[in-house]
Curated annotation (Swiss-Prot):
Source organism: Helicobacter pylori (strain ATCC 700392 / 26695)
Coiled coil: none
Gene Ontology cellular-component terms listed: plasma membrane
Protein name: Probable iron chelatin transport system permease protein HP_0889
Bilayer-spanning residue ranges: 7-27, 64-84, 91-111, 113-133, 142-162, 164-184, 187-207, 241-261, 275-295, 301-321
Source superkingdom: Bacteria
Length: 326
């Protein structure tokens, strides 16, 4: 039977394999040289060799960022599906991706800097707008879903208009971000994603047994002493922060928040006490694997969002057939 620590071990093994063989594999002697050089760098301030720079400044941040972003998106997806009692919900329902896309389009078109900052604020403002619209419309699950769909369409149209009017080079930069990419990962990006993961999921992890009760009807939750509106709003704030910070440094990476929670449920059931951590780890593993696929299937470094779609869409279709017994 699959255990949570099995997934954690798989993440570690895959990360080590990517560091060892990613892009261009290193021989045992080269790895010994890298380890010695890195040790002397930290102990004796020795200058890093070119191989050490490749490992420490290119491969390692990319691996760490893939793990953090994958965990944030999949964890957000499983929480969203639980609180909405809908298996087709993902983190981008709140307008996070379209808000971030508009922020990136404005950053590239106007200021040409601070892309991650504007992407984050765009995602957060979109989420707050959806929550405000839902409150006006009565705090129902249906109104929240419809508000997210409407606002996402509107913000995507604005971002598309900006992309249409900018010069081709800037339009291409917007498209690359829209497809999701980890190719320019840095330790600063890793720190941003880690902050989002911590701020979003420490409260959710502590409240996971209460969040479980949101899978019941609101009346049943109230009878058990849970305020479903307040708890659902808190969950949405946590999910918004985690997803917005993840998207701000990686671009829009689809399917993880939708598919991975379903995979985790196959092995761990619907109880969030086990499901939340397993979804975080599975999402981390899946995005790192997708990034490996994106780097190896063609001579070019494809945006990782393409790989997640290629891997995620057929798998989700298989899940649908499996559920219906086809």
């Amino acid at each position: 039977m699959l255990k949570t620590y099995h997934i954690a071990l798989a993440c570690v093994i895959l990360a080590v394999v990517v560091l060892l063989f990613g892009g261009e594999s290193l021989s045992l002697e080269e790895w010994q040289e890298v380890c010695l050089n890195v040790k002397n760098h930290f102990l004796h301030n020795e200058e890093l060799s070119s191989l050490s720079i490749i490992i420490l400044e290119i491969r390692l941040p990319r691996v760490i960022l893939a793990l953090l972003v994958g965990a944030s998106l999949s964890g957000s997806g499983v929480v969203m599906q639980t609180i909405f009692r809908n298996p087709l919900v993902d983190p981008f329902l709140l307008g996070i991706s379209s808000g971030a896309m508009l922020g990136v389009a404005m950053a590239i078109a106007v200021v040409e800097s601070n892309i991650a900052i504007l992407a984050f604020f765009g995602a957060i403002l979109a989420s707050l707008a959806v929550l405000a619209m839902n409150r006006v419309l009565g705090n129902s699950v249906l109104s929240l879903v419809l508000s997210g769909v409407v606002l996402s369409a509107f913000l995507s149209a604005l971002a598309g208009a900006i992309k249409f009017f900018v010069i081709p080079q800037k339009a291409q930069a917007i498209v690359v971000w829209l497809l999701g990419s980890l190719s320019l990962s840095s330790y600063k990006d890793c720190l941003i994603a880690f902050i989002g993961l911590s701020l979003g999921f420490i409260p959710l992890f502590l409240l996971r047994w209460r969040i479980n009760l949101l899978s019941l009807s609101d009346a049943q939750s109230l009878s058990l002493g849970i305020n479903p509106v307040l708890l659902r709003s808190l969950c949405l704030v946590c999910v918004s922060v985690a997803s917005a910070l993840a998207v701000s440094v990686s671009g829009t990476i689809g399917w993880i928040g939708l598919v991975i929670p379903h995979v985790a449920r196959l092995f761990f059931g619907a109880n969030l006490q086990k499901l939340l951590l397993s979804s975080l780890l599975m999402g981390a593993f899946f995005l790192l694997l997708a990034d490996v696929v994106a780097k190896t299937i063609t001579p070019y470094d494809l945006p990782v969002g393409i790989a997640t779609s290629v891997l995620g869409a057929p798998f989700f279709l298989w899940l649908l057939f499996r559920t219906r017994g086809v």
